[in-house]
């Protein structure tokens, strides 16, 4: 039924949104020195955020594993999933500019994907 299909798609989109939010928050936390998921130390990127430090995370339905050396997290899985990349473009005293790239993997592109980024 139409209602069943809508409910299934809404659930799938909510799952993707949670994955993206977790991915971006984990990477942003690593680069800005606010911690991040799965890592108790400060990454090299957090200690010295500049244009040479790039952090990425990929999630394809499994939990990500953070590594401190490159502030990168990745996982493997089946067809589909997302990747979020965060890179510091420039910085100055008291601030910086960063670029985010969100990529969706899989056979079918879902143009309903929306990303909201909130910093605490």
Curated annotation (Swiss-Prot):
Keywords: Cell wall, Secreted, Virulence. Its main location: secreted. This is PE family protein PE10. The keyword Nucleus does not apply. Residues 40-51 have a biased composition (Low complexity). It is found in: Secreted, Cell wall. Forms a complex with PE9. The complex interacts with human TLR4. It comes from Mycobacterium tuberculosis (strain ATCC 25618 / H37Rv). GO terms for cellular component: extracellular region. Belongs to the mycobacterial PE family. The C-terminal domain is required for interaction with TLR4 but not with PE9. Together with PE9, induces macrophage apoptosis through human Toll-like receptor 4 (TLR4) signaling pathway. Interaction with TLR4 leads to increased levels of phospho-IRF-3, increase in the transcript levels of IFN-beta and pro-apoptotic genes, up-regulation of IL-10, down-regulation of IL-1b and enhanced levels of macrophage apoptosis. Residues 29-59 are annotated as: Disordered.
């Amino acid at each position: 039924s139409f209602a069943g299909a809508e409910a299934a798609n809404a659930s799938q989109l909510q799952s993707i949104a949670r994955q993206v939010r977790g991915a971006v928050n984990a990477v942003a936390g690593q680069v800005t020195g606010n911690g991040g998921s799965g890592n108790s130390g400060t990454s090299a990127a957090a200690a010295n955020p500049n244009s040479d430090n790039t952090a990425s995370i990929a999630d394809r339905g499994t939990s990500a594993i953070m590594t401190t050396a490159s502030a990168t997290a990745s996982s493997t899985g089946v067809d589909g999933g997302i990747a979020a990349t965060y890179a510091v473009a420039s910085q100055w005293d008291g601030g910086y500019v960063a670029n985010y790239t969100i990529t969706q993997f899989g056979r079918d592109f879902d143009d309903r994907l929306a990303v909201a980024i909130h910093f605490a």
